Amino acid sequence: MKEKSPIFHALTGVKGVYTAQTGKLRCTAYRLSDRSMLLYSPVAGLGDAARESLSILGDVSNLLAPNHYHNKGLAEYFRFFPNANLVCSTTALPRLSKITKLKFGGLGSLENNLPDNTELLEPDGLKTGEIWLQIKNKGEVIWIVTDAFTAQPTAVGEFTQEPLLLGTFPRYGVRDSELFRTWVETKISELAPTIVIPCHGGILKCDNLGKSLSNLLRKTL
């Protein structure tokens, strides 16, 4: 049976990745090894419609706060899915615990449930505890990122090719710009992304995306 969702839309050409938007903010749902769903950066305000659409996709087992600023939807989604694991990086934990009053676990249990083609990335040089997902899928390399990159908004199902830097990111997200830039360029040299799904703005896809990201960081950081 083909999976359908009125709120979470399948990413074109990529199995197991679904995105939902409210305004300029995006939540990404990803299917784990046990067929349950990970929510990357739950977005406040999606409400009952999001919960109903997720029930079509599968049980939600993990709610990932991908940095310490992306926390406004966590309480709402934890009420929806009280059996889900709330997880974050150790760097993000202090502020998340203070702001949300929720109890978070580490990333180990989530990592153990990731498909073989997927890994968590924790960029060097940032101060927010940002966590990315890297997925290899049918020739595509997908990065799911939080505040590091953005793009002009697009319609559902469409892509854009020009990466941008979120205006607040250099001041509030970056601890050491050279360290972060070097880390990103090293990752690109190892396995360049062809798709970037940011939490803000449009989804990026192009053949030279890695080079575009590198050039952007060299110009702006």
Segments predicted by a language model, with ranges:
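Short, hydrophobic/aromatic-rich segments at coil-to-beta transitions
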Residues: T12-T19, P115-L120
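Active-site environment of divalent metal-dependent phosphoester hydrolases
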Residues: L46-D48, Y69-G73, L93-S97, T150-Q152, ...
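Metallo-beta-lactamase
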Residues: K2-H9, K15, S36-P42, V87-T220
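Active-site HxH/HxHxD metal-binding segment of metal-dependent hydrolases
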Residues: R51-L114
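Pre-active-site segment of Zn-dependent metallo-hydrolases
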Residues: T19, Y30-N62
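Short His-Asn-centered micro-motif
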Residues: Y40-V43, L64-H68, C88-T90, P123, ...
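Short beta->alpha connector loops
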Residues: G23-K24, V43-G47, N67-H70, G125-T128
